[in-house]
A protein has these predicted regions:
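NAD(P)-dependent Rossmann-like dehydrogenase/reductase catalytic/cofactor-binding core
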Residues: 2-23, 197-208, 220-226, 230, ...
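NAD(P)+-binding Rossmann beta1-loop-alpha1 motif at the extreme N-terminus of oxidoreductases
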Residues: 2-71, 132
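Amphipathic alpha-helical segments at domain termini/boundaries
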Residues: 14, 39, 90-110, 196-200, ...
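Acidic/polar active-site rim loop that often engages polyanionic ligands
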Residues: 43-44, 53, 169-179, 288
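Rossmann-like dinucleotide-binding cores of NAD(P)H-dependent redox enzymes
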Residues: 53-88, 178-189, 211-215, 229-235
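Rossmann-like NAD(P)-binding element
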Residues: 53-60, 70-78, 83-139, 145-146
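Rossmann-fold dinucleotide-binding core
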Residues: 138-225, 230-233
Length: 327
């Protein structure tokens, strides 16, 4: 009965506000991810406001977007300089910047967050914007590891909240993970899927449907769609952690494990190379959050070697040393 009642409530709440096509987008966070998403959205004809509390970061991001577009022009408009200049001008006209999120979300169709990977900060942001955003506005997070359900809990628009996980560098990577919670309305989820496709991306759905699983497992798996790490990171991070454990147990050197996965599985990078690229601090942060959520899961157990390297501030390529040393 509780499950049925919940579905009825969901149906009422989601039908109260019909989601039209997403045309106006507010992106919170002027870092590399936020700027990349802004570039792709503007290139595909969306009106974009890029928001950050630091105006210098915004200016740097806008300059970075223009520089990225110039590289595109060199390839696509090599023999048509006027057309290339027109292309850049048209895309940049779709982008504006602001340091005040509250002043720009009143008429936006989508608020997409790409800020620091901290649950309380994300909750605080969305909780504040929920009070001033338009009723039809969809909220979405670009989190790579935090549960969308937890982030959405700070708002009153649970049916209009989802996840859009892009991959870096955004202009080049085709994949977008579209995440729905047990409260996300189908209309909202469909709007996020359509938006991803409008960006020229290939979306994968991280939202389970009751028709996809046996009836007797529905209650058990009702939150499967919001599993830690969604699809890519949920598979990738345990893979990298098991590589570390394999090395810790003395079953293979990091060099041999990397070579084995590149030549045997066809991966472009081995797990240790990938860890150094992602950042060991980032990997540890993700694992710590997962362990807290699911402490008995053997796939999510910590690694002494990883913890030691992070404690020594050896985060990988960005610090010059991780599992490998970099000049």
């Amino acid at each position: 009965m509780a499950f049925f009642t919940h579905q009825v409530i969901r149906g009422l709440s989601s039908s109260a506000v019909r989601n039209a096509a997403i045309k106006h987008v507010t992106i919170i966070g002027g870092g590399q991810m936020g700027a990349g998403i802004a570039q792709v959205a503007a290139t595909t004809g969306h009106s974009v406001v890029l928001v950050d509390t630091n105006e210098e970061i915004l200016k740097k991001s806008a300059k970075g977007i223009e520089g990225s577009l110039k590289r595109v022009v060199k390839k696509k408009f090599a023999d048509k300089p006027d057309a290339g200049a027109e292309f850049i001008a048209k895309v940049m006209a779709n982008v504006s910047i602001s340091t005040d999120a509250a002043s720009v979300v009143g008429s936006t169709d989508l608020v997409l967050e790409a800020i620091v990977e901290n649950l309380k900060i994300k909750q605080g942001l969305f909780g504040a914007l929920d009070k001033v955003a338009a009723a039809h506005t969809i909220f979405a997070s670009n989190t790579s590891s935090l549960p969308i359900t937890d982030i959405a809990s700070s708002t009153s628009r649970l049916d209009r909240f989802g996840g859009l996980h892009f991959f870096n560098p955004v202009p080049m990577m085709k994949l977008v993970e579209v995440i729905g919670t047990s409260a996300t309305s189908q209309e909202t989820f469909d709007s996020l899927l359509a938006f991803s496709k409008a960006l020229g991306k290939t979306p994968v759905s991280c939202k389970v449907r009751s028709s996809d699983i046996p009836y007797y497992t529905i209650l058990r798996y009702v939150h499967l769609q919001d599993t830690p790490g969604f699809i890519v990171n949920r598979l990738l991070v345990p893979y990298m952690m098991e590589a570390i454990r394999l090395h810790e147990r003395g079953h293979g050197s990091k060099e041999d494990i990397d070579i084995a996965m590149k030549l045997g599985a066809g991966y472009p990078m081995g797990p240790f190379e990938l860890l150094d690229y992602v950042g060991l601090d980032t990997a540890k942060f993700i694992m710590d959050g997962w362990v807290e959520k699911d402490p008995d899961n053997p796939l999510m157990q910590p690694s002494e070697m990883l913890n030691k390297l992070v404690a020594e501030c050896k985060f990988g390529k960005k610090t010059g040393e991780g599992f490998y040393k970099y000049k």
